[in-house]
From Swiss-Prot:
Protein name, entry field: ATP synthase epsilon chain
GO CC, one annotated term: plasma membrane
Subcellular location: Cell inner membrane
Organism: Neisseria meningitidis serogroup C / serotype 2a (strain ATCC 700532 / DSM 15464 / FAM18)
Function: Produces ATP from ADP in the presence of a proton gradient across the membrane.
Gene of this entry: atpC
Membership in a protein family: Belongs to the ATPase epsilon chain family.
Main location: membrane
Membrane topology qualifier: Peripheral membrane protein
InterPro entries for the chain: ATP_F1_dsu/esu_C_sf, ATP_synth_F1_dsu/esu, ATP_synth_F1_dsu/esu_N, ATP_synth_F1_esu_C, ATPsynth_dsu/esu_N
GO molecular function: ATP binding; proton-transporting ATP synthase activity, rotational mechanism
Subunit and interaction comment: F-type ATPases have 2 components, CF(1) - the catalytic core - and CF(0) - the membrane proton channel. CF(1) has five subunits: alpha(3), beta(3), gamma(1), delta(1), epsilon(1). CF(0) has three main subunits: a, b and c.
Cross-referenced Pfam families: ATP-synt_DE, ATP-synt_DE_N
Keywords: ATP synthesis, Cell inner membrane, Cell membrane, CF(1), Hydrogen ion transport, Ion transport, Membrane, Transport
Amino acid sequence: MSIMQVEVVSSEQNIYSGEASFVVVPTVQGELGIYPRHEPIMSLVRPGALRLTVPGEDKEVLVAVSGGVLEVQPDKVTVLADVAVRSAEMDQARAEEAKKAAEAGISQAKDDKALAEAHKALAAAIAQLKTLDYIRSHKK
């Protein structure tokens, strides 16, 4: 089985570093499925669920990403995410509350910095909600 090295890093921490046999990344062009030996590309990441298939494990590793940059090399995938959260750390109620707070922050922003922070928080909340929806729709 072919494998590749995958790094998912946010501005706060290293979220995932290890091997994978398949990765799905939400990009601005749509979901991109990546196998080992993929052609080199770079793309912008959109909010959503990043999915990793780890060799020898029967379940996917899920990470909510709010945006960022994807770099693909034949033997390595790197995602530099604005915000990234492992699925085990997510909570539906907290994500919904964060989305409401971010939407309020956008409407009440007094300057560009506050508006940018509110948009960043909204993207993070949307990414978590999309990941939680994916988990719910794929339960066995």
